[in-house]
């Protein structure tokens, strides 16, 4: 994880997560992220609907991983599109300045993306001054699954927190590859700010 500062009050995080089995034979690799909030959206990066559908994946029923059996209200789509997730903390009872976490992720062939709900975040439920009753709210969850290896097709993400009063400074996130085949582990990211800075 890297922090990129673009101004006195603006910046974002970059995460490039690679995963593979040392001896090959990779079935799949998962990228798991959850965030506070009462609502979450997951769309293509251009804002179009991904048409997520209910799924039984991410559970013991899928014979993949016991730890995912606590997830519920799971939805999934197979897509190679770049995606954007937005987690929202509704602050209507605290002055109306909603808080967002914006996540952009590069698409890849043989990838699936999921939304799900997880049990509430116990540790934070005891923190005073939280903007909503965390004990009554499940934890919003995003999962990306890469079939095969995820070393040359890593999970490439950009995260930016924002609020209603201090909106996102990012206009778009795009990705590029290099033509040099020896650099097959290269991850190129182009973040365009609303002020024109790239």
Regions found by a protein language model. Name each.
Residues 1-198:
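CBM-like, beta-strand-rich accessory domains located in the C-terminal region of large
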């Amino acid at each position: 994880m890297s922090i990129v500062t673009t101004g006195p009050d603006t910046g974002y995080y970059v995460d490039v997560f690679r995963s593979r089995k040392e001896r090959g034979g990779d079935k799949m690799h998962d990228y798991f992220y959850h965030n506070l909030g009462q609502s979450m959206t997951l769309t293509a990066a251009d804002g179009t609907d991904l048409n997520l559908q209910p799924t039984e994946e991410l559970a013991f029923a899928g014979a993949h991983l016991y730890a995912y059996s606590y997830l519920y209200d799971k939805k999934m789509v197979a897509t190679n599109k770049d995606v954007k997730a937005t987690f929202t903390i509704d602050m209507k009872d605290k002055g109306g300045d909603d808080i967002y976490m914006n996540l952009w992720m590069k698409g890849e062939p043989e990838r699936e993306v999921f939304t799900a709900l997880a049990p509430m975040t116990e540790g934070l439920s005891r923190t005073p001054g939280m903007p909503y009753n965390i004990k009554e709210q499940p934890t919003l969850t995003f999962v990306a699954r890469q079939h095969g290896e995820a070393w040359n097709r890593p999970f490439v993400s950009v995260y930016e927190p924002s609020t209603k009063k201090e909106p996102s400074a990012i206009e778009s996130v795009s990705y590029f590859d290099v033509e040099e085949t020896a650099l097959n582990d290269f991850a190129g990211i182009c973040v365009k700010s609303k002020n024109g800075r790239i």
